[in-house]
Regions:
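Glycine-rich phosphate-binding loop
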Residues: 93-111, 189, 194-200, 204-277
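Conserved small/polar residues in nucleotide/adenosyl-binding loops
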Residues: 327-332
Length: 344
């Protein structure tokens, strides 16, 4: 058996934990035997849900009864001490006992604890929260989705480097095509920070990724670009708007196809296509946001997802490690020049 990817798992974070976390691990392991899980949390509860469904050579339980609560502020979560499942799982990456960490817990606390334990990549000032979004041609990396409400032009330029690196690690055969989210596509549109960022990215673009200028909100999923950069406030609003729109569409479609006998017959005749459509809009299949900018990425699962969603966040961990994002980072000169790090 080849060397396994070691994934540290905060089993106590998120709604319905540790049950959904352990079920997510079991679901993922049923189709992927490349991972070794270091599971942090209440040992009795974890063993109950594992129920001997995974061979012990694929996991280890590190027991702790302490956890960060969803209601904690970021500082309250950090002050709960070094014995929480979240802290210990991140610390295991710091100690090189695991390759990457995933948690469905409190987002603010996760970022603070990660920054207390892990180093920032040289010349990167702020980490960014990134995620994969579906588009007409495949997937896009979008960042920042809420880690930084206010950003300088340098921060946004750094995000373009990190986002391009992440996309390249996940899709090695493709060239990252970066765009800056704005209220218009013309160069004169936007505030001063956006305009300064445009100039930085336009002047410093390198062959490692393409810069396509501005992109508007109605173009986020048209597939023309695959890395979209914004500040955390704008990105989070865009994310929540997209999620709400997807839920609205699926809800209205469900009502339309169950309102009459003809509609029900139509839904039966189009079952295969409707199933594909529903799957394409299923947020669980895109679960797994990534804090990048730290010397080891931290994967954040949505706290409200189910075991299938958590399983997908494990897949994200696996792909990040295999794509060598962990071993690539911009040097000071490269970061200033908006140059994407080469693969290890």
């Amino acid at each position: 058996m080849s060397e396994l990817i070691k994934i540290a798992v905060d089993a106590m974070g998120g709604d319905g934990s540790p049950e959904k976390i352990i079920k997510g691990i079991i679901h993922n392991h049923s189709s992927n035997k490349e991972n070794f899980f270091k599971i942090f949390g209440n040992e009795k509860e974890i063993q109950k849900y594992l129920n001997n469904q995974i061979d012990t050579k694929f996991f280890e339980i590190i027991p702790t009864d302490n956890m960060v609560k969803s209601t904690d502020s970021p500082l309250e979560g950090a002050k709960r001490g070094k014995n929480t499942s979240m802290w210990l799982s991140i610390e295991s990456v710091k100690k090189k006992e695991a390759d990457i960490v995933v948690s469905a817990g409190n987002t603010g606390a996760l970022l603070v604890i990660a920054k207390l334990n892990l180093k920032m990549i040289e010349n990167i000032d702020k980490p960014a929260l990134s995620a994969l979004w579906p588009n007409k041609n495949g997937m896009s990396v979008v960042l920042d989705l809420g880690a930084n409400i206010e950003c300088s032009s340098k921060n946004l330029s750094d995000f373009s480097i990190m986002g391009a690196s992440l996309y390249k690690s996940l899709y090695p055969s493709e060239t990252p095509n970066v765009a800056l989210l704005n209220i218009g596509s013309e160069e004169l549109k936007g505030n001063e920070v956006i305009k300064e960022t445009f100039q930085l990215m336009n002047e410093n673009k390198k062959k490692n990724f393409n810069f396509s200028g501005y992109i508007e909100g109605n173009e986020l999923m048209n597939g023309k670009v695959n890395v979209i950069v914004s500040d955390g406030f704008t990105g989070n609003v865009a994310l929540k708007t997209a999620e709400g729109t997807a839920n609205f569409i699926t809800g209205e479609l469900r009502k339309a196809l169950s309102g009459s006998l003809i509609a029900k017959i139509s839904s039966i005749l189009n079952f295969s296509n409707l199933k594909k459509f529903k799957k394409r809009l299923d947020p669980r299949l895109y679960n797994g946001a990534i804090f990048i900018g730290l010397d080891t990425p931290v994967v954040k699962s949505h706290g409200g997802t189910d075991y299938i969603g958590f399983s997908n966040s494990i897949d994200v961990c696996n792909r990040i490690v295999k794509g060598c994002l962990l071993y690539t980072s911009p040097s000071p000169r490269d970061a200033h020049e908006s140059r994407m790090p080469s693969s290890a």
